[in-house]
């Protein structure tokens, strides 16, 4: 499969989870937007991705509705793994006409921080860190060289920012700033924008 334009990176540490993406939206060598948010908060979870922007937005809307439906139907919150599995099933249902996107999905529940990587047909892989999109090869090298599950969320945020900046320097479809989303082990959410 051709590499999907954009770069998104996720990192799980003992204190929480961080997802980040750059903001450039490009197609066929053209920059369509410099303000495209590709990191989403869905209920108490985070999702980031690379690929067709409209597909990412559609998946975000579907997941918002499905998670709310699950919680209203069962009367209890959905776990991170169950929500990731739900996303996997949704992607698989569209395997004939797939959503053209690679996705990072994560959150924190009673089992601690969790990070999952999904491809366009719903393959679900749990990992400590991951990068997707056209800048993934560059970003993953930065993560591999410095990752430590015991690092603080502040250090994790610095590392993920360094990984995205490295991909922006080498990947023409990535750029125009960095969106970061953080959930700590207590479930507190924070988002940041870093101009670059």
UniProtKB/Swiss-Prot annotation:
GO molecular function, one term: threonine-type endopeptidase activity
Superkingdom classification of source: Archaea
Active site location: 7 (nucleophile)
Propeptide: 1-6
Subcellular location: Cytoplasm
Disulfide bridge positions per record: none
The family this protein is said to belong to: Belongs to the peptidase T1B family.
Cited PANTHER family: ATP-DEPENDENT PROTEASE SUBUNIT HSLV, METALLOPROTEASE TLDD
Name assigned to this protein: Proteasome subunit beta 1
